[in-house]
């Protein structure tokens, strides 16, 4: 006692908080010093002390103890600001959806993490005795993230599929959640409750399986005599010191350790804390230690390979059941992992990248050649360095050197000024850690309907060559050009009869109808894409009008382009300049097969001028087409008037339209008849008024197509023979039949006084026929009824125009009947007769009676983008006709530039070219663009581009141009300018299509500087207009759009746009036609413009843009759909495939452990392992040559996979704050990796192919038979491993009892009863502890005889030298692959 008192005086006084870890340390040191019994007394006193203090504290918890962190407000605000900027960038097309999602998640994750770190200091400063603070940081159950949710913010949540919801929960539980936040957080809560119930049972089951695998592993020897080890290296800072110490303490060295010439530790010495400290301070060579992996036995383990027992700190005793301890050590924390999930409920955890920050202000410099530009995963521009990059930062007085590791992103440019603590580089997270990653597909859907373009080449994936899946080779934009497609508000009707040839694409379009029940005249819009065309077309002949069905689709649109062009139709268009026929599909010459034709015919006058109410285009509806001859009769809808008035019905609603056109709104009737016309001399084989059947011979080579009554009329020089089909009735005397042409009788009217009373289902035509004077009979003929729809005024359908106050162009659809009433129609053989023609009539300014505009100029315009040519039909309304104000030869009339330098002065010198006049002329040039053609052979289609899809932008600052041209001319005084700046009045319809080309003329002295394009020498020669497309080519469009121009005898030169680069210092952006412009791009001086789109019209002071939405896509993305295809809202546009780290599963720990142990997670383990091991094997093959390389490769594969598995399992537990010693995991992993699968070839006499055998057993058998066994390393899950042991009794007691016992009986298996479980089942003594001695006596004689063969040892030594002592080689090629940041850096095993 006195001794104790004396010692107490010398004791050190510790004044610090003792938490869980400190208690552990204290206890282990007490055991070391005082032994077990004494320690338990001390701990008893500590327990009493603790309870007394806790009672005295009487801690309580109220809601007021939860203090919100003050800095939260501005942190959240800052994060919101960042997401807003991000949203904008996404809208402008600078980042794509995946990058946006990633970045917003990281922004919020960082915010939430920062709040979490603020929490502890905040409590410590404001209220250190706050019960929440005391409890949460005392080491009691629970963790910081729960407190963080109470007082910080809940942050990001996962949805049930484990995907991130990118809407964070900004409130904490103390402030209360909003409704949305509550619903989002319910995902996690529900999952937490369910998981707690499910996982508790799972954890128990996990323990059971683990114990099953390793129950037979007992310490049976002191030393197995192995010479292998696993090397652990403290150097290069790859492994944190804490983990390094944990790995080494309690292990046994496999090799002597030298420090220079001096040996500081010998083989088989166990490592204590002192030795570890020496290793750390000296930083010696890698330390080779013995682990359960290196032990040479199959079914047991030796003391030295196991190391110290964690219970008492000495080497493990013989006979200890280390297997069962290992299984329980891993399974037991599983229950804790489970319960943890409940509290955090689905809060997202994910790694963010590490940043390198600048140490001080200054200029940054690095070698440009070592980096290449790239995109970060957030879509920011950055430089990627492939090797170590040395960066210097020059501040005023000091140079800082920073080394940036390879594979990092450099976020600044060379010679850029950086501020202190600015992020200059981002180290890629996950170069060393093989964290669980998965590949995810994300689909991006189109937000609007329109036409798809892309701005780069697109590869076809080889397996999808014929489909619409394309891969992007480089980062580019996809554009959806706005424009609706044709939709009908009626239920789709089929235009096809059985076995018609039909146009495939038109049926596709019919699927997209929107059906609407209330149908009135405005909604009666059809989409007609069809054809009845069946005549043969010879290859060399141009298809003619009679054979092509001209269609204009009656849609609610003011802009359409159907078509496909090819050589034939081009010729056709050129031949009839004033008409433009657009076949929807052309004849494919290669296949020599007939394709159906249908098209819209657009008719323009030769001079390009349309008057009011003139027909712009027409369409022959195939439903109003007849093959046979007949008579047209008009009717009204009033049924009674037909019966009462036996005479003709009065005309209604006929409007004289273009002399020949009569518009009818009522139904009209077509009475078919067969007509044959013969020359006078021919002999007719039937009599007048006789009845004939079908297919009767009429003349020599003619047969009748229908049966009925024959009428023969002889006219001058020809005979006309008609056959009327129908019934013949002989009326009674009371019937009065009109003596004139005939009566139409509506359906449902019964003629009772006919001989047979009969109700007619359809309209019939009753005609009186008088063969002789007294006798007559009545022919009742079938009638085909047609209803003509009312013309729709399309003006109401145009959206309000953005380009001017209102859209003053109107299109009306008018149907008119081509033939007059009662007119007989003669059809010539094999052609069809069009009864009704549908026209598109152009009108404007109907509201203003006194409008001055009488004519509109029309022209075709092509806009080409990336080889896809769209033709637009352009209609300009001209407010006033332009006439020359002076004579042509009067020089003062056209001299725009006079001697005076003042611009305003000479702008007014020419009234025609005066600037004000041009401005006025442009501003009064109101027009609508209509897209029309598409020179793309694949897809005929109709698109509507209304004026609301375009917008005008401007004005540009055009003042510079005058001066520059003037100055350039001053240098060369010989030039006499006749006409300078400004468009030519004569080509008015193209005034808007000169982009920045101004026509200027002069003597050809400066020809070298300008591009000479066109010489117009004769009068009335055609001037072509040229357009630039996106790639800067100049197009000469189709000749049908040329305009005849009464030009002067002048030389015209085009100014090439390079000219501007030479002369204009302050030039505006040169905008070419068809170019795509992103939102927020500065074009003119008055700031950025607000919409993105494609340039359609370039004018002197403004441009018109068709609005479009850009979507960014990165390489490897899959694009759905074809170039130029029409997409609808919600169609899939792009699919991105991206890797994301698996979001920490809501149940964080247990499922992961189970997945790893059951070797179930297919992606992560096997992918990474294969990648790593491929690399190894390559190198080894190079070093050792093929046969040895493969042999060692197999062993290395196993070793490598073992180490990787251990690290994975440890990572899961460490992330939960659970400490498990590596050796427990190693014992388990050793069991699941110790089996191999026998391959087909070789050794069939010992093992069956596909049999699972132990690795060591295979090696031994091979040595005994002096023959090699072919096998493949295999990872078994713990369930399979427990069903593949040497004891069938233990297998049967685990699972599938009947199956296992039956199999064992069939094979005649023997159970050697080596494990615990078999003996328990049978009731024998279990071979552990005291009961294991019996087994030892038998095997004593084999104790330490290593199996030796000279060859093998020689080989092992050599290989060891090559592999593991060639330091340079090792470090360069292999170590890079296997160092693992947070875990042990195991190196392959040493054989020395």
From Swiss-Prot:
GO terms for cellular component: chloroplast; DNA-directed RNA polymerase complex; mitochondrion. Keywords: Chloroplast, DNA-directed RNA polymerase, Metal-binding, Nucleotidyltransferase, Plastid, Transcription, Transferase, Zinc. Belongs to the RNA polymerase beta' chain family. RpoC2 subfamily. Its main location: plastid. In plastids the minimal PEP RNA polymerase catalytic core is composed of four subunits: alpha, beta, beta', and beta''. When a (nuclear-encoded) sigma factor is associated with the core the holoenzyme is formed, which can initiate transcription. DNA-dependent RNA polymerase catalyzes the transcription of DNA into RNA using the four ribonucleoside triphosphates as substrates. Its EC number is 2.7.7.6. This is DNA-directed RNA polymerase subunit beta''. Binds 1 Zn(2+) ion per subunit. Zn(2+) binds at residues 224, 295, 302, 305. The keyword Zinc applies. It catalyses: RNA(n) + a ribonucleoside 5'-triphosphate = RNA(n+1) + diphosphate. NCBIfam families: rpoC2_cyan. Its cofactor is Zn(2+). InterPro entries: DNA-dir_RpoC2_beta_pp (IPR012756), RNA_pol_beta''_euk (IPR050254), RNA_pol_Rpb1_3_sf (IPR042102), RNA_pol_Rpb1_4 (IPR007083), RNA_pol_Rpb1_5 (IPR007081), Rpb1_funnel_sf (IPR038120). It is found in: Plastid, Chloroplast. The lineage of its organism: Eukaryota, Viridiplantae, Streptophyta, Embryophyta, Tracheophyta. GO terms for biological process: DNA-templated transcription. GO terms for molecular function: DNA binding; DNA-directed RNA polymerase activity; zinc ion binding.
């Amino acid at each position: 006692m006195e001794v104790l008192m004396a010692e107490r005086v010398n004791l050190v006084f510790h004044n610090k908080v003792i938490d869980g870890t400190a208690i552990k340390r204290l206890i282990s040191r007490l055991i070391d010093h005082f032994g077990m019994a004494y320690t338990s007394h001390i701990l008893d006193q500590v327990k009493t002390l603790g309870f007394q203090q806790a009672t005295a504290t009487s801690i309580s918890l109220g809601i007021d103890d939860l203090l919100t962190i003050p800095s939260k407000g501005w942190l959240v605000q800052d994060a919101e600001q960042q997401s807003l900027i991000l949203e904008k960038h996404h809208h402008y097309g600078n980042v794509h959806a995946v990058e946006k999602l990633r970045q917003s998640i990281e922004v919020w994750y960082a915010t939430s993490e920062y709040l979490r770190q603020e929490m502890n200091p905040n409590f410590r400063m404001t209220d250190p005795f706050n019960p929440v603070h005391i409890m949460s940081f005392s080491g009691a159950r629970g963790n910081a993230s729960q407190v963080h949710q109470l007082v910080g913010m809940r942050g990001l949540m996962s949805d049930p599929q484990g995907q991130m919801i990118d809407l964070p929960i900004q409130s904490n539980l103390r402030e209360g959640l909003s409704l949305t936040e509550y619903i989002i957080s319910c995902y996690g809560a529900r999952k937490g409750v369910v998981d707690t119930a499910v996982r508790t049972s799972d954890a128990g089951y996990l323990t059971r399986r683990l114990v099953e695998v390793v129950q037979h592993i007992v310490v049976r020897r002191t030393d197995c005599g192995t010479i292998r080890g696993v090397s652990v290296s403290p150097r290069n800072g790859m492994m944190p010191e804490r983990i390094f110490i944990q790995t080494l303490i309690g292990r046994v060295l496999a090799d002597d350790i030298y420090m220079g010439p001096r040996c500081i530790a010998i083989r088989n010495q166990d490592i204590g804390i002192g030795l570890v400290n020496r290793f750390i301070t000296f930083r010696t060579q890698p330390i080779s230690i013995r682990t359960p992996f290196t032990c040479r036995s199959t079914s047991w383990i030796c003391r030295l390979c196991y190391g110290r027992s964690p219970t008492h700190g000495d080497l493990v005793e013989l006979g200890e059941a280390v297997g069962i301890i290992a299984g329980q050590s891993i399974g037991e924390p599983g229950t804790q992992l489970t319960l943890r999930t409940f509290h955090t409920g689905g809060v997202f955890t994910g790694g963010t990248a590490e940043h390198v920050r600048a140490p001080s202000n200054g200029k940054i410099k690095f070698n440009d050649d070592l980096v290449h530009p790239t995109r970060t995963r957030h879509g920011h521009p950055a430089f990627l360095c492939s090797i170590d990059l040395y960066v210097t930062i020059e501040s005023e007085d000091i140079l800082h050197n920073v080394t940036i590791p390879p594979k990092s992103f450099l976020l600044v440019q060379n010679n850029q000024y950086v501020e202190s603590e600015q992020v200059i580089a981002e180290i890629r997270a996950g170069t060393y850690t093989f964290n669980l990653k998965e590949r995810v597909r994300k689909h991006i859907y189109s937000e609007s309907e329109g036409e798809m373009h892309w701005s780069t080449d697109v590869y076809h994936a080889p397996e999808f060559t014929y489909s619409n899946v394309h891969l992007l080779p480089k980062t580019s934009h996809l554009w959806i050009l706005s424009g609706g497609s044709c939709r009908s508000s009626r239920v789709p009707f089929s235009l096809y009869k059985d076995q018609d040839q039909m146009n495939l694409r038109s049926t596709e379009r019919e699927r997209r109808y929107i059906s609407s029940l209330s149908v009135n005249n405005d909604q009666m819009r059809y989409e007609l894409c069809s054809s009845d065309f069946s005549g043969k077309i010879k290859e060399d002949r141009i298809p003619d009008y009679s054979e092509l069905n001209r269609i204009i689709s009656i849609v609610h649109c003011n802009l359409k382009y159907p078509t496909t062009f090819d050589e034939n139709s081009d010729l056709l268009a050129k031949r009839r300049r004033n008409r433009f026929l657009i076949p929807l599909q052309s004849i494919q010459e290669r296949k020599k097969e007939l394709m159906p034709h249908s098209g819209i015919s657009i008719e323009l006058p030769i001079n390009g001028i349309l008057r009011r109410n003139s027909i712009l285009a027409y369409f022959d509806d195939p439903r109003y087409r007849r093959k046979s001859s007949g008579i047209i009769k008009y009717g009204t809808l009033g049924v009674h008037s037909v019966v009462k008035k036996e005479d003709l019905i009065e005309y209604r609603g006929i409007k004289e339209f273009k002399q020949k056109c009569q518009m009818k709104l009522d139904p009209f009737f077509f009475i078919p008849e067969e007509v044959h016309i013969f020359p006078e001399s021919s002999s007719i084989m039937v009599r007048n008024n006789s009845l004939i059947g079908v297919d009767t011979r009429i003349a020599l080579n003619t047969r009748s197509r229908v049966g009925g009554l024959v009428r023969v009329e002889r006219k001058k020089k020809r005979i006309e023979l008609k056959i009327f089909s129908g019934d013949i009735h002989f009326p009674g005397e009371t019937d009065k039949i009109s003596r004139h042409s005939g009566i139409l009788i509506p359906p449902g009217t019964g003629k009772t006084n006919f001989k047979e009373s009969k109700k007619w289902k359809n309209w019939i035509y009753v005609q009186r026929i008088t063969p002789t004077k007294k006798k007559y009979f009545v022919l009742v003929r079938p009638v085909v009824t047609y209803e003509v729809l009312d013309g729709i005024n399309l003006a109401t359908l145009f959206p309000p125009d953005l380009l001017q106050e209102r859209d003053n162009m109107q299109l009306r659809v008018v149907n008119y009947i081509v033939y007059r009433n009662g007119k007989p129609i003669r059809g010539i053989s094999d052609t069809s007769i069009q009864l009704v023609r549908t026209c598109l009539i152009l009108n404007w300014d109907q509201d203003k009676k006194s409008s001055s505009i009488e004519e509109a100029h029309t022209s075709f315009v092509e806009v080409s983008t990336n080889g896809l040519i769209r033709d637009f039909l352009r209609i300009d309304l001209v407010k006033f006709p332009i006439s020359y104000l002076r004579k042509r030869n009067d020089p003062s009339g056209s001299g725009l530039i006079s001697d005076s330098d003042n611009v305003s002065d000479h702008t007014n010198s020419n009234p025609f070219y005066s600037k004000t006049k041009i401005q006025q002329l442009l501003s009064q040039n109101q027009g609508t663009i209509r897209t029309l053609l598409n020179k793309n052979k694949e897809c005929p289609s109709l698109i509507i581009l209304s004026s609301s899809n375009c917008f005008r932008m401007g004005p540009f600052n055009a003042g510079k141009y005058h001066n520059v041209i003037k100055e350039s001319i001053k240098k060369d005084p010989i030039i006499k300018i006749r006409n300078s700046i400004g468009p030519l009045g004569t080509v008015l319809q193209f005034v808007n299509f000169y982009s920045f080309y101004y026509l200027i003329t002069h003597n050809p002295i400066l020809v070298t500087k300008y591009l000479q394009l066109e010489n117009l020498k004769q009068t009335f020669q055609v001037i072509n207009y040229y357009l630039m497309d996106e790639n800067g080519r100049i197009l000469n469009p189709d000749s049908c759009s040329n305009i005849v121009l009464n030009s002067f005898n002048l030389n015209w030169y085009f100014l090439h746009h390079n000219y501007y680069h030479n002369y204009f210092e302050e030039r505006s952006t040169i905008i070419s036609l068809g170019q795509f412009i992103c939102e927020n791009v500065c074009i003119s001086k008055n700031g950025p413009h607000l919409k993105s789109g494609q340039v359609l019209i370039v004018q002197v002071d403004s441009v018109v843009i068709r609005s479009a939405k850009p979507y960014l896509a990165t390489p490897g993305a899959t694009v759905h759909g074809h170039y130029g295809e029409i997409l609808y809202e919600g169609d899939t546009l792009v699919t991105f495939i991206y890797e994301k780290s698996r979001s920490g599963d809501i149940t964080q720990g247990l499922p992961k452990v189970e997945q790893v142990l059951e070797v179930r997670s297919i992606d992560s383990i096997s992918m990474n392992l294969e990648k790593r091991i491929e690399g190894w094997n390559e190198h080894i093959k190079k070093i050792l040559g093929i046969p040895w390389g493969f042999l060692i490769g197999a062993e290395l594969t196993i070793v490598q996979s073992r180490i990787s598995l251990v690290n994975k399992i440890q990572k899961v537990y460490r992330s939960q704050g659970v400490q498990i010693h590596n050796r427990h995991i190693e014992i388990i992993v050793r069991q699941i990796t110790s089996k191999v699968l026998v391959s087909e070839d070789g050794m069939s006499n010992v093992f069956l192919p596909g049999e699972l055998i132990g690795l060591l057993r295979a090696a031994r058998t091979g040595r005994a038979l002096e023959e090699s066994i072919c096998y493949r390393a295999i990872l078994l899950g713990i369930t399979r491993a427990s069903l593949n042991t040497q004891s069938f009794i233990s297998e049967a007691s685990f699972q599938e009892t009947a199956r296992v016992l039956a199999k064992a009986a069939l094979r005649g298996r023997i159970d050697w009863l080596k494990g615990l479980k078999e003996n328990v089942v049978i009731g024998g003594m279990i071979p552990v502890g005291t009961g294991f001695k019996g087994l030892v006596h038998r095997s004593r004689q084999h104790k330490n005889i290593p199996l030796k063969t000279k060859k093998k040892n020689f080989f092992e030594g050599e290989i060891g030298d090559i592999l593991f002592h060639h330091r340079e080689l090792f470090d360069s090629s292999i170590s890079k692959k296997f160092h693992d940041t947070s875990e042990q850096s195991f190196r392959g095993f040493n054989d020395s």
